[in-house]
């Protein structure tokens, strides 16, 4: 609110709340590993969903978006495992993606005109290199168009979309 010129917020996945806590990205990696092994993933799903719910509770608002976030987390376990080079990236990107949805809702609940923007809508097209995506040159023109928005745009970081519509992440920590 203090800077009306700020039009974009790029969101990371929730990190550690304390030294004993787990980053959501690390929890998603664990979930992915259990899923591809055919192990029970219910505890992984619940932990991640509860982590987002804890954020809502701490921020003190009633979230309608939690239904969609819960579904997005559980739906990861319905994706095909075989011949899916982008499965790991899709799991990892869920941290940023769901956090962006939640932050956009929080902003709106605090009288800030805000909108979640998926990297696909933002035009963040990337190379098809799982875990090491590179932004394609044409993306910058599309991103420039977003500056015309009157809303604060909440965009998940860490990933883009390939030309064949696959979620593809940048290198972790990069």
Predicted segment positions?
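Nucleotide/pyrophosphate-binding catalytic subdomain
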Residues: 1-174
